[in-house]
Amino acid sequence: MSDKIIAMLNQDLEGEHAAIIQYLVHAYAMGEGEMACEIEAIAREEMRHFDWLAEAIVGLGGVPTIKRGNMRTGGDSVSAWMRNDVLQEEEGIALYEQHIKAIEDRKIKRLLERILSDEKSHRGSFEHFIVKAERAGAKDLRGSRQDNVTKILDWGIEHEYTVVLQYLLHSYLTPNEEAKEELQDQAINEMQHLGWLSEELVDSGGSPRIEHTDIDQSVKTADMLRADIKIEKEVAAEYDRAAGAIDDAGLKRLLLRIRDHEVYHIDVFSDLLAEEEE
């Protein structure tokens, strides 16, 4: 029965993953404002669901999937996006209700009921946002700019998304509690970077594309940390190079700030690896 529950929870995990990215794409495209902030807050609640589900899967002896479910990112207006977000929530609600009926494990059932309550609230929020977007005349602020600046920002977004998933997966699988905590902390920091870069790209006239590259799926903590150190070293050097190629002072400061964070991550992971190898 555990295998069936794990499969259902991984299906739920895919849905949460899709919702997070869909909502962030919409929020970033709207720029700064009250409704964009509210949508980001909903995305953060979906991140909490993602974490709960992943931990439950590991507790049952499974491996959390990093596959992303189907997203609804089309639509020619902000209100159309909000309708798609309602549909995303309705799909999630139906799936959670189905799994709650199918699962007998009391603790898992209780967890899904807790998440379901949030999803119903989110659906109501997005229904409200349909009207709010129409009344406020909310617009898609993304542009079609494509040059060296947008190329650098697109690369940064791709990297940050990749390591968010990699560090979270490693945090779920490692038995090392200190490493787990640090990996989750750095994943949160990388999520901040993703937001900064996406917002900068929209402000610069571009359009964020949130996709990831290959993710290390090591099962031994030392191997995880070696992979994490390797990618951080490569990326810190690339942020440094990119900052040197940028004339815009504000963007240069942003890239150097992120570079400094990546250097910090290298030091943290290196200390953890040294302890793990003792």
What do these predicted ranges mean?
Residues 1-278:
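Iron-associated oxidoreductase/ferritin-like identity signal
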